[in-house]
Amino acid sequence: MPRSRINGNFIDQTFSIVANILLRVIPTTSGEKEAFTYYRDGMSAQSEGNYAEALQNYYEAMRLEIDPYDRSYILYNIGLIHTSNGEHTKALEYYFRALERNPFLPQAFNNMAVICHYRGEQAIQQGDSEIAEAWFDQAAEYWKQAIALTPGNYIEAHNWLKITRRFE
């Protein structure tokens, strides 16, 4: 039974109903419909913290999905799972892959910046200020890209850039 039929969450149920209607109305191939079903089930599993199941659904959606824009969101969600699991190197890889297909994902730039900032903080704790500065500089570059795509968002990042004199 597809996950969307067993999920008791009202919002997920509403999303599933709307998605099913759209799939019937919008002309799509059976492969596109199947890819979306796996993507939807992946999001449902991810929202419940069932990351292994979510990844299985996302990988299957990736196998079927041909549209680069849609693939970017699948890759982004895979990155989110790896971030949640503390697998930052893998997460960065998936965010990069998402941005290769869709360079207008400010949330991917933001998440990459957060990981780099975290690594900078770790380097400070280990007493390596030179490495920390390199990570902070990289975080700044990613935050600048996120802010450029969505001015007015990422206020804390914008303030950090100003305070650390990394904003131009």
Swiss-Prot record:
TPR repeat windows: 35-68, 72-105, 120-153
TM annotation in the entry: none
Keywords noted in UniProt: Chloroplast, Membrane, Photosynthesis, Plastid, Repeat, Thylakoid, TPR repeat
Pfam families per UniProt: TPR_1
Its membrane topology: Peripheral membrane protein
Compartments where located: Plastid, Chloroplast thylakoid membrane
Function: Essential for the assembly of the photosystem I (PSI) complex. May act as a chaperone-like factor to guide the assembly of the PSI subunits.
PANTHER family the UniProt entry points to: CELLULOSE SYNTHASE OPERON PROTEIN C, TPR REPEAT-CONTAINING PROTEIN MJ0263
Family according to the record: Belongs to the Ycf3 family.
Protein name: Photosystem I assembly protein Ycf3
Organism name: Atropa belladonna (Belladonna)
Species classification: Eukaryota, Viridiplantae, Streptophyta, Embryophyta, Tracheophyta
